[in-house]
UniProtKB/Swiss-Prot annotation:
Catalytic activity: adenosine(37) in tRNA + dimethylallyl diphosphate = N(6)-dimethylallyladenosine(37) in tRNA + diphosphate
Residues reported to bind ATP: G8, P9, T10, G11, T12, G13, K14, S15
Site (Interaction with substrate tRNA) location in chain: S103, R124
EC number: 2.5.1.75
Protein name: tRNA dimethylallyltransferase 2
Function: Catalyzes the transfer of a dimethylallyl group onto the adenine at position 37 in tRNAs that read codons beginning with uridine, leading to the formation of N6-(dimethylallyl)adenosine (i(6)A).
GO molecular function: ATP binding; tRNA dimethylallyltransferase activity
Length: 314
């Protein structure tokens, strides 16, 4: 069964659309949803990640949700292996795999079947020691000397990617970009649909979404996860909303600190949306649909358009 993929920026209604599509098809074919959001992999991280509550999933099987503890590190390679196995198992059952999410690397690694460069723990440890000694700016300067093209696209403060680039350059003897995958025919010949909407409208949705998360108990959720090791988690601790709330709690959790956390979460989400758009828009395989209007009639029209595109592609 040819998979269907729904991608797009945060706040465009991907998860709700996926459930509606699965529900619409349920009388004809079974549908199983595969998550492609890095932070929805974590158990207990529900409110801040926009995870659809179990009661609202309409009995539709979901995969790649709640598979990691907050202390475990999520990796693109690990996700790729697990999600690919899920998709192939779903298809083997004669069901439709429906991939949904906005984590750019996760989506592309899966659809383009990325081959990841080898790792060398000793080399990585040496660059990590160098990072600890000189800091991210000096380490980035090392990358500028060894691979200017990689340094040009890796932010100065992104120490993890800088370390990885230096590791790959040393292992392969080639520029980091030489190991980067290219966009080709999507794996499993998946149909790819993108949802987006006007920036002004999406910014308003993100503000409302952030407020709703805090109103629903994001602060309490973060507090409940701290004894589980949230602050120690390499990946989980960086999640939007969670990182900001932890900073507010450190600052005393007064009204001013928590208001600042909410504002910073909204601003950080808007910045993330810009990066999502930039990444996804370069993929010419995507058929984009406008999700600006949120009336019931327009949502129905979007579902029909998605299904039509999938049927034509199939």
């Amino acid at each position: 069964m040819r998979p269907l993929t729904i991608i797009g920026p945060t706040g465009t209604g991907k998860s709700d659309s996926a459930i509606e599509i699965a529900d619409r098809l349920s009388s004809k074919i079974a549908v199983e949803i595969v998550n492609a959001d890095a932070y929805q992999l974590y158990r207990g991280m529900d409110i801040g990640t926009g995870k659809v509550p179990l009661a609202q999933r309409r009995g539709i099987p979901h995969h790649q949700l709640d598979v990691l503890d907050v202390t475990e590190t999520a990796t693109v390679a690990g996700y790729q292996r697990s999600a690919a196995a899920d998709i192939e198992a779903i298809a083997s059952r004669g069901a439709l795999p429906l991939l949904v999410g906005g984590s750019m690397l996760y989506v592309q690694s899966l659809l383009d079947d990325w081959a990841f460069p080898a790792k060398d723990p000793a080399i990585r440890a040496r660059w990590e020691r160098r990072l600890a000694q000189v800091g991210p700016a000096r380490l980035h300067a090392d990358l500028v000397r060894r691979d200017p093209a990689a340094a040009a696209v890796i932010p100065l403060n992104d120490a993890r990617r800088t370390v990885r680039a230096l590791e790959v350059v040393e292992i392969t003897g080639r520029p980091y970009a030489a190991s980067a995958p290219r966009i080709g025919s999507p794996r499993w010949d998946s149909a790819i649909i993108g949802l987006d909407c006007e920036t002004k409208v999406l910014d308003e949705r993100l503000a409302a979404r952030t407020k709703a998360m805090f109103d629903r108990g994001l602060i309490e959720e973060v507090i409940s996860l701290l004894p589980c090791g949230l602050a120690r988690g390499v990946t989980a601790s960086r999640a939007l909303g969670y990182a900001q709330v932890m900073e507010a709690l450190k600052a005393g959790a007064d009204t001013q600190a928590l208001d600042r956390a909410r504002q910073q979460t909204c601003l950080a989400t808007r910045r993330y949306v810009r990066r999502q758009r930039s990444w996804f828009r370069r993929d010419r395989r995507v058929r984009w649909l406008d999700a600006t209007v949120s009336t019931a009639a327009h949502r129905t029209a979007i579902i029909e358009a998605v299904l039509g595109a999938w049927r034509r592609a199939s």
